[in-house]
Structures are given as structure tokens and as C-alpha cells.
Amino acid sequence: MIELPEALNIAGQINDTIYGKRVASVIAVHTPHKLAWYYGEPPKYSDLLIGRTIGKANAYGSMVEIKAENANILFGEGAGIRFHGKSEPLPLKHQLLIEFEDHSAMSVSIQMYGGIGSFLDGELDNPYYKVAKEKPSPLSPDFDKVYFNYIISAQEVQKLSLKALLATEQRIPGIGNGVLQDILFNAKMHPKKKVNTLSNKDKEDLFSSVKTTLSAMATQGGRDTELDLFGHPGGYKTILCRNTVNKPCPICGTIIKKEAYMGGSVYYCEKCQQL
């Protein structure tokens, strides 16, 4: 799943590869997918985009948005975005395929679930999109200790677990159940630990881990569990994920555990991250 580090990396790669290209053709909903949702109206994507010039791509939380003059192209969650050079074969299955006048292309294929869209400026009335654009990125200067303290001190979050605090309700756009695992590992906190049990030092450590962990992931091109615009895994070696379950903790050697929790999985070292 795309989360903030991957969104930042893919946006940068898009700017390096398709910025300035003119759209020649658009195919939407070529391959049906039950868990693909579309922003805007897919039958109108062609009329909306053909002839327009690709502008800058930006990451907003876990979303990647590409400008195309006064139109926008949006991807999120499990959208597998790939660039295809002039001589490269195009995928047979996809939910969106955009070809450019120079015969290069970009395709989007939904993995588990995800969103794709195209719409004119100001047209999309989607709360997740709006919040992702309005709230400060956790890697921006505006996301400081004062702002984080505002989030973690709210009365309504005191009985929540740290997983629920960080990865639900769009409190911090871009943090999902993936990057959450290493953030909590580096902070030495269990994902089920309650917010109201945190000391002031715990809160400082958690804030620091949010910043440093996400920064490491972003600067290394995303996590090694996710693929970039060219189908390559990110350079950040994920500590806690499906690939490290039942392997020794890199700090203490305790076997990493996996549990079902809150509709997904959590990974932790029971010695380093005591509840």
C-alpha cells in the first residue's frame, strides 16, 4: 500500500519522467476490479485529459496527485503506478492507462484495493482528499511538537491504542498500518499501548520516531515491501513486516510476532515493545 514515503518517492519519479508530456490517449476501467474506486467519472477521463500537458506531481498523505493544466489525476492506497518507456510492452490488465504523444505511457493497476481518478480543479468533494491536502505533512516544519501534542492530548483519543491514534481517522495523513509498525518499534512502544498511559517522555519519543522513521523511509525511496514507478522495491529495509515475522529482533534477538488487531495485523517485539 502507498503510504507517505512511497507517495513522496513516486511523485518525485513522475516529475522526472512524464512532466511536460502531452496526453495522447486514455483508457479507464479496462479491467474490472471490485475494490477499485474511481474519483470523478471514468467515461469522461479521455475528454478531460487528452491534449493536456502533464504538470507537477505532489504527495498528499498517501495520495499522489498529478496536475494536467486545470485537471488532476489522483491515485492512492493500493494503486500500482508504473511508467513504460517507448519500446516497453504495456500491461494487458490495468484500471487506467495513459499514453503520451512520445509513445511512452503510465499505467495504474489496483492491487488489493485503491483509488484512481481524474477531475477538474475544485470538482472533487472527497473528505479524505481534502484532509490530506489541508493537514500538514508529518515531514513538514508545520508538523512540530506543538501540533503533535494537540493531536495526542485530545480528550477523545485518550482511550485509543497507539495504532488507532496514528493510523485511523486521518489524524496524520500518510501514516497507515505499514509505516506505523517501524514508527512504534523505534519508539519502543507496543501497538496496543493506550494513549492515556504515555508519559511526557513517551510522547516526545513517539513524536521523534514519527519524524525520523518517516524521514529515513522517504530519503531511501520508500519501504522495501513496496514498489516504485519502475517496479523496483524501495531502499528502506523494513524492520517489522510480513517478511520479518518469526525472525529475530535486530535489537535483542527476540522472535518478532504477528497478531490480528483492528481489522489488520500488527508486528512487534514483545521485549523491546512491552505493553
Predicted regions and their residues:
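A short, charged helix-loop
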Residues: I116-V157
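Short, mixed-charge, low-aromatic patches
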Residues: M1-P5, S104-S109, G122, E134-P141, ...
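Generic signal for short, ordered secondary-structure residues
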Residues: I2, G78, P127, K145, ...
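Alpha-helical structural motif
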Residues: E3-E6, I10, Y19, D144, ...
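Short clusters of hydrophobic/aromatic residues that line enzyme substrate/ligand-binding pockets
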Residues: L49, V131-E134, L139, M189, ...
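Acidic, proline/glycine-enriched N-terminal capping motif
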Residues: M1-K130, L275
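Basic, nucleic-acid-binding surfaces and adjacent catalytic neighborhoods in DNA/RNA-processing proteins
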Residues: A24-K44, T53-N58, I151-L275
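Short histidine-centered catalytic/ligand-binding loop motif
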Residues: S87, K130-P141, K193-N200
